[in-house]
Every structure is written in C-alpha cells, then in structure tokens.
C-alpha cells in the first residue's frame, strides 16, 4: 500500500510540473504572438478584416469618385455590401434617400451604427448580405466587396429582378475578364448581356486599401437594360445557345453549333455576324452572339 501511495504521489507531482510547463509555454507563445503582431504593425482591426477577407478603401478621393460612378438615384434605396468603417456609406447617404449598409463583422457593424445613429438615411445591418431578401421596389447595390465572395455576390445581383444597377470594387482581373478585357468574353457575361450591360470603370491601386491586398482592384458596373436586347420569353433559348457554344464539343464554335443547327444556317449566321469559321469562342462578342441567335432562330 505504501509503495502504491508513493507512485500516486509521484505521478501527481509530475502532472503538476507538466501543467506548469504548459502554462509557461502558453504565456511564452502569447507573448511571442503579441510581439509578432507589434513588429508587423497589424492592429486588432487589421486582423479582423483579414478574417473576413476585407480590405477597406481608405483614400477619400477614390471613395468619392467611386460613389459618383455608382450614380445612385436620389429617390431609391441603395444596399451597400461590406460597409466596414462607413467611408462609402456616408458618401452614398449624401446622394440618395436611404442606405441599408450590410456588414458581416458585428464589431464593425456596431461601431458604424453608433457613428451614424443621428443620420436617418442610414440603416446598418449586422449580417450576411447574401442572406437578405430582395427589396420589393427598384434598388441599387454598391460595395467594396470581399474578393472571395465576388462570384456569389454577382450571382445574387443577377438574380434580383428589381435591381437597377450594381457597382462593385472587385479584383482587377475579375473585372477585366467579365468586361471583354484582352478581347475575350466570359460565358457569364455573354449569357446575361441581352438583359445586363457589363462595364469596367476606374482601376484602383492596392495602396489605397487597408490591409494592402496583393493585387490591384477595379470598379465593375452591371446595369439592367430597361428594354432587353432579346425578348424575355426567348432568353432561355439564347442561354442554351451560349451554353452549347462554350461547351466546345466538336472542336470549335462552328462545329459545336452544327451539331444542333443546319450547316447552311450556321454558315449564314457566321457571315451575318462577321465571324471567321475557326474563331475561338471566347473572342465572339456579346453582340455577335445576339446576331447568331437571331439568324439561327429565324428572327
């Protein structure tokens, strides 16, 4: 029995020493982390922004140009995505009737709500913009958005039927690829072009953001056309044509279309759209796609 008690006591003493060692290591690690953060110059706000992929636009003149480019209707509601510190929010409120500012980080949302409490034009919502319901009246969307959520936010906007305009700060390459940069056109842009015009605005240097991102940005604007270039009842057929062309079956756009349409009609469509027979599908402009559609569907 005495031997057993001695073993138990020795084990407990060892556990206590081990626990003190872990606590000391934790204190050392915490101190090292704080020192690392201090050396890197990162504040708590910087770390919070990195968690949510946020890079706030801090240059006032750039903010003002961005809001002017957004050109919100004075009488409409504007939904702002990623309000952050409110630099864009306040500029928007000068120009429109009501701004609903969405900020997913509750810390920043609470600070912005407190800072704008006296302005009846601004409503701050702490939550995910992508989960919000669409307004039942015409509205616009404006925002300096987290780059990682760009595709989801753009999809939300394209599916919002009462949305008049969308003006976003995105990665430069995303804006270029969606607006015919390098004379190439994406499937998404072509498929939505009859109803939505895509265009790129100002390029924004990465140095105007905090934290500083790895790449430059640009302003991307989507504007829903008052009168679609193709009747709404035919949009399904148009998108189906675009899907067929971009699948690449047959080795070329011409060959892909001949799998579904008479060869003579495809040839007539190419002549009317001024397309070479071996054209790469990405180099076909949205306008040429519409011409092809009209020829192939006998319009």
UniProtKB/Swiss-Prot annotation:
<dbReference type="InterPro" id="IPR029063">
    <property type="entry name" value="SAM-dependent_MTases_sf"/>
</dbReference>
<feature type="binding site">
    <location>
        <position position="82"/>
    </location>
    <ligand>
        <name>S-adenosyl-L-methionine</name>
    </ligand>
</feature>
<comment type="similarity">
    <text>Belongs to the class I-like SAM-binding methyltransferase superfamily. rRNA adenine N(6)-methyltransferase family.</text>
</comment>
<dbReference type="GO" id="GO:0003723">
    <property type="term" value="F:RNA binding"/>
</dbReference>
<comment type="function">
    <text>Probable RNA methylase. Confers resistance to carbomycin and several other macrolides, lincomycin and vernamycin B, but not to all macrolide-lincosamide-streptogramin B antibiotics.</text>
</comment>
<feature type="compositionally biased region" description="Low complexity">
    <location>
        <begin position="21"/>
        <end position="31"/>
    </location>
</feature>
<dbReference type="GO" id="GO:0046677">
    <property type="term" value="P:response to antibiotic"/>
</dbReference>
<keyword id="KW-0949">S-adenosyl-L-methionine</keyword>
<protein>
    <recommendedName>
        <fullName>rRNA methyltransferase</fullName>
        <ecNumber>2.1.1.-</ecNumber>
    </recommendedName>
</protein>
<feature type="binding site">
    <location>
        <position position="57"/>
    </location>
    <ligand>
        <name>S-adenosyl-L-methionine</name>
    </ligand>
</feature>
<dbReference type="Pfam" id="PF00398">
    <property type="entry name" value="RrnaAD"/>
</dbReference>
<keyword id="KW-0694">RNA-binding</keyword>
<keyword id="KW-0614">Plasmid</keyword>
<feature type="region of interest" description="Disordered">
    <location>
        <begin position="14"/>
        <end position="53"/>
    </location>
</feature>
<dbReference type="InterPro" id="IPR023165">
    <property type="entry name" value="rRNA_Ade_diMease-like_C"/>
</dbReference>
<dbReference type="InterPro" id="IPR001737">
    <property type="entry name" value="KsgA/Erm"/>
</dbReference>
<feature type="binding site">
    <location>
        <position position="128"/>
    </location>
    <ligand>
        <name>S-adenosyl-L-methionine</name>
    </ligand>
</feature>
<keyword id="KW-0808">Transferase</keyword>
<feature type="binding site">
    <location>
        <position position="144"/>
    </location>
    <ligand>
        <name>S-adenosyl-L-methionine</name>
    </ligand>
</feature>
<dbReference type="InterPro" id="IPR020596">
    <property type="entry name" value="rRNA_Ade_Mease_Trfase_CS"/>
</dbReference>
<dbReference type="InterPro" id="IPR020598">
    <property type="entry name" value="rRNA_Ade_methylase_Trfase_N"/>
</dbReference>
<keyword id="KW-0046">Antibiotic resistance</keyword>
<keyword id="KW-0489">Methyltransferase</keyword>
<dbReference type="GO" id="GO:0000179">
    <property type="term" value="F:rRNA (adenine-N6,N6-)-dimethyltransferase activity"/>
</dbReference>
<feature type="binding site">
    <location>
        <position position="103"/>
    </location>
    <ligand>
        <name>S-adenosyl-L-methionine</name>
    </ligand>
</feature>
<dbReference type="GO" id="GO:0005829">
    <property type="term" value="C:cytosol"/>
</dbReference>
<feature type="binding site">
    <location>
        <position position="55"/>
    </location>
    <ligand>
        <name>S-adenosyl-L-methionine</name>
    </ligand>
</feature>
């Amino acid at each position: 029995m005495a031997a057993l008690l001695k073993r138990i006591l020795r084990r407990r003493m060892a556990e206590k020493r081990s626990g003190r060692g872990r606590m000391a290591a934790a204190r050392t690690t915490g101190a090292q982390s704080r020192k690392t953060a201090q050396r890197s110059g990162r504040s708590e706000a910087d770390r919070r922004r990195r968690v949510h992929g946020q890079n706030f636009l801090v240059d006032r003149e750039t903010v003002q140009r961005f809001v002017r480019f957004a050109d919100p209707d004075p009488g409409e509601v504007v939904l702002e995505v990623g309000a952050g510190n409110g630099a864009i929010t306040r500029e928007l409120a000068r120009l429109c009737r009501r701004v609903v500012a969405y900020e997913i980080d509750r810390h920043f949302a609470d600070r912005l709500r407190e800072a704008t409490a006296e302005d009846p034009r601004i409503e701050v919502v702490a939550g995910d913009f992508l989960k919000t319901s669409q307004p039942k009246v015409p509205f616009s969307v404006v925002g300096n958005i987290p780059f990682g959520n760009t595709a989801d936010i753009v999809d939300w906007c394209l599916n919002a039927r009462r949305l008049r305009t969308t003006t976003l700060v995105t990665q430069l390459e995303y804006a270029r690829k969606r607006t015919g940069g390098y004379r190439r056109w994406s499937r998404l842009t072509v498929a939505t072009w009859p109803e939505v015009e895509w265009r790129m605005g100002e390029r924004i240097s990465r140095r105007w953001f905090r934290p500083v991102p790895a790449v430059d940005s640009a302003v991307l604007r989507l504007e829903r056309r008052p009168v679609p270039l193709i009747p709404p009842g035919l949009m399904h057929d148009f998108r189906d044509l675009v899907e067929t062309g971009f699948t690449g079956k047959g080795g070329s756009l011409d060959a892909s279309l001949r799998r579904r349409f008479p060869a003579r009609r495809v040839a007539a469509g190419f002549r009317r759209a001024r397309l070479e027979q071996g054209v790469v599908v990405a180099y076909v402009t949205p306008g040429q796609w519409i011409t092809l559609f009209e020829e192939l569907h006998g319009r």
